[in-house]
Swiss-Prot record:
This is Protein FAM83A. Belongs to the FAM83 family. All members of the FAM83 family of proteins share a conserved N-terminal DUF1669 (domain of unknown function 1669) domain of about 300 amino acids. This domain mediates the interaction with casein kinase 1 (CK1) isoforms. Therefore, it has been proposed to rename DUF1669 the polypeptide anchor of CK1 domain. Involved in mitochondrial maintenance during adipogenesis. May be acting by playing a role in the maintenance of normal mitochondrial function. Residues 1-298 are annotated as: DUF1669. It comes from Homo sapiens (Human). Directly interacts (via DUF1669) with casein kinase isoforms CSNK1A1, CSNK1A1L, CSNK1D and CSNK1E. It is found in: Cytoplasm. Keywords: Cytoplasm, Phosphoprotein, Proto-oncogene. Residues 320-332, 348-357 have a biased composition (Low complexity). One of its GO terms (biological process) is cell population proliferation.
Length: 434
């Protein structure tokens, strides 16, 4: 009889907050054993077992219909036979989770192993520590700073390494920006996708006829969220809801924006830009997620070496002058103009590198070397850049027009789809309007 009068943790609190005579209790953040037992029952026996445990524990239904369906759809069998876990007490269908007591909410959830070393540098060599710490927030309502355009500018102005963590990736134009950065400018790109969004990403690749042969400098990998494991051994994985972009290890774009057409045109989103020491937190999070990721497309096992310190010669020789100048012009502000000198808050490392710069008391700088190989080693031979035959103002004006060309034309110029017509389209060479 006493069992029927038992109240679960959530139900008891609901009764207290409804009553005017009960004093507020101290906040309790401990695990809910009744909720754990009910979740285990849902994994092992379905909805009927879930409701039965809720009735026995005197607990309320704490899962929404969407959450309950997700748990049942994502449930996975244990890797080993159930009798090895429970011995003779385990039945033919495994352990009865309602008869097991546990002091933790995730009874068998194991902590992730130490991530593989993606890059290693001393504190003085960390690129993000050379930038001033700042935080900027962008909303969808600001029309002159469209979030989709901000993301695309960030991609087109990255010169060395681009790291992306995303839940859904189906925007073909953003994909073209990434392909152009990797195949035309030698930028190494690593995309970590939520496991649930891999199918949609592959559908997009099939529609535009993109295969592994087009991803020579890109690594597409999948990653899951946290793992919930029941006493019986059945488990399910959560989703990746984190979304951020790290550009050249100097600044981060993070927010609610997903790489979809709807997010770029109708969904309301928020985007934040971080520079300075805050980037280190995203760097560490990416290390852990990369360590548990699995290859999907592109580079399967990138070579993990430390980046070349500034001023040291890279192992694969000198980079071309055009690529070196692009790296020198890299700024932590992806939304500013191309001239870093017009922004006093950004670092300007190429102020005296050009022939038209004013005379300085110090000697001319040494030949440029590749300042940063990225966390996966030297770029592939296909990623090497050659000097441009015309390095005048027109080249600088039209160098970023890939972000403003139609999707089909971008794929054609990347050599990924056959051209519809060989005629030249002069109207596409107009200067972009921001």
């Amino acid at each position: 009889m006493s069992r029927s009068r038992h109240l679960g943790k959530i139900r008891k609190r609901l009764e207290d907050v409804k009553s005017q005579w009960v004093r507020p209790a101290r906040a309790d953040f401990s695990d809910n054993e009744s909720a754990r037992l009910a979740t285990d029952a849902l994994l092992d026996g379905g909805s009927e077992a879930y409701w039965r445990v809720l009735s026995q524990e005197g607990e309320v239904d704490f899962l929404s219909s969407v959450e309950a369906q997700y748990i049942q759809a994502q449930a996975r069998e244990p890797p080993c036979p159930p009798d090895t876990l429970g011995g003779a007490e385990a039945g033919p269908k495994g352990l009865d989770s309602s008869s097991l007591q546990s002091g933790t909410y995730f009874p068998v959830a194991s902590e992730g192993s130490e991530p593989a070393l993606l890059h290693s540098w001393a504190s003085a060599e960390k690129p993000y520590l050379k930038e001033k710490s700042s935080a900027t927030v962008y909303f969808q309502t600001v029309k002159h700073n469209n979030i989709r355009d901000l993301v695309r500018r960030c991609i087109t102005r990255t010169s060395q390494v681009l790291v992306i963590l995303m839940d859904v990736f189906t925007d073909v134009e953003i994909f073209c920006d990434i392909l152009e950065a990797a195949n035309k400018r030698g930028v190494f790109v690593c995309v970590l996708l939520d496991q649930g969004g891999v199918k949609l990403f592959q559908e997009m690749c099939d529609k535009v006829q993109i295969s592994d042969s087009h991803l020579k400098n890109i690594s597409i990998r999948s990653v899951e969220g946290e793992i919930y494991c029941a006493k019986s051994g059945r488990k399910f994985a959560g989703q990746i809801r984190e979304k951020f972009i790290i550009s050249d290890w100097r600044f981060v774009l993070s927010g609610s924006y997903s790489f979809t057409w709807l997010c770029g045109h109708v969904h309301r989103n928020i985007l934040s830009k971080f520079t300075g020491q805050a980037v280190e937190l995203f760097d560490e999070e990416f290390r852990h997620l990369y360590a548990s990721s699995k290859p999907v497309m592109g580079l399967k096992s990138p070579r993990l070496v430390a980046p070349v310190p500034p001023g040291a010669a890279p192992a694969n020789g000198r980079l071309s002058s055009s690529s070196g100048s692009a790296s020198d012009r890299t700024s932590s502000n992806p939304f500013s103009g191309r001239s870093a000198g017009s922004h006093p808050g950004t670092r300007s490392v190429s102020a005296s590198s050009g022939p038209c710069s004013p005379a300085a008391p110090h000697p001319p700088p040494p030949p440029r070397f590749q300042p940063h190989q990225g966390p996966w080693g030297a770029p592939s031979p296909q990623a090497h850049l050659s000097p441009r035959p015309h390095d005048g103002p027109p080249a600088a004006v039209y160098s970023n027009l890939g972000a403003y060309r139609p999707t089909r034309l971008q794929l054609e110029q990347l050599g990924l789809v056959p051209r519809l017509t060989p005629t030249w389209r002069p109207f596409l060479q107009a200067s972009p309007h921001f």
